């Protein structure tokens, strides 16, 4: 069924709003993936705070115009499934990467983060970004490690001073 002009404008506006509030975007080709599997992917995406939609390339080009995802324009070929991460920058990339492992026909095309185009081969850069909680945990571990090391060095320095004085 052909879309009317009003429907097209509504789609462009909806995707544009999603793009403006998103932290990152990933696009993929879902040809050959069954409806059941796509339904599971959509449900998982909603749970992960990822906006996901299949959009015509011409409408997608208009929707990302003026956003930091304009760099993806050259990758809009063939059927395009776009996902915007709303809560964590790596959420959509991680979701698509896991789904692609289980579904051979699902192909990640590209991604974008902070206006930078990320080719499909480097999508791991985006997928492996730590979540806020993981980053805080790593920071705390580093700080704890540093303070323990500093304590050991301080005690060793005090011991050396006492030995030198004796």
From Swiss-Prot:
Coiled coil: none annotated. The keyword Translocase does not apply. It comes from the Bacteria. One of its GO terms (biological process) is translation. Keywords: Ribonucleoprotein, Ribosomal protein, RNA-binding, rRNA-binding. InterPro entries: Ribosomal_uL10 (IPR001790), Ribosomal_uL10-like_sf (IPR043141), Ribosomal_uL10_bac (IPR022973), Ribosomal_uL10_bac_type (IPR047865), Ribosomal_uL10_CS_bac (IPR002363). SUPFAM superfamilies: Ribosomal protein L10-like (SSF160369). It holds the Pfam family Ribosomal_L10. Gene3D superfamilies: 3.30.70.1730, 6.10.250.2350. CDD domains: Ribosomal_L10. GO terms for molecular function: large ribosomal subunit rRNA binding; structural constituent of ribosome. GO terms for cellular component: large ribosomal subunit. Forms part of the ribosomal stalk, playing a central role in the interaction of the ribosome with GTP-bound translation factors. Belongs to the universal ribosomal protein uL10 family. Part of the ribosomal stalk of the 50S ribosomal subunit. The N-terminus interacts with L11 and the large rRNA to form the base of the stalk. The C-terminus forms an elongated spine to which L12 dimers bind in a sequential fashion forming a multimeric L10(L12)X complex. This is Large ribosomal subunit protein uL10. The lineage of its organism: Bacteria, Pseudomonadati, Pseudomonadota, Gammaproteobacteria, Aeromonadales.
């Amino acid at each position: 069924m052909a879309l009317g002009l009003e429907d097209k404008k509504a789609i462009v506006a909806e995707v544009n709003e999603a793009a403006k509030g998103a932290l990152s975007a990933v696009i993929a080709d879902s040809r050959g993936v069954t409806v059941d599997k796509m339904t599971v992917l959509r449900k998982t995406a909603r749970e992960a705070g990822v906006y996901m939609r299949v959009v015509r390339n011409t409408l997608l080009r208009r929707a990302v115009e003026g956003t930091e995802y304009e760099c993806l324009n050259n990758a809009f070929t063939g059927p395009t499934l776009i996902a915007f991460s709303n809560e964590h920058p790596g959420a959509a990339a991680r979701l698509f990467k896991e789904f692609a492992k289980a579904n051979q026909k699902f192909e990640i095309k590209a991604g974008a983060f902070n206006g930078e185009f990320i080719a499909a081969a480097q999508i791991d850069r985006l997928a492996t970004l730590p979540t806020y909680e993981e980053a805080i945990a790593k920071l705390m571990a580093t700080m704890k490690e540093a303070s323990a090391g500093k304590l050991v060095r301080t005690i060793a320095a005090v011991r050396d001073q006492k030995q030198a004085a004796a």
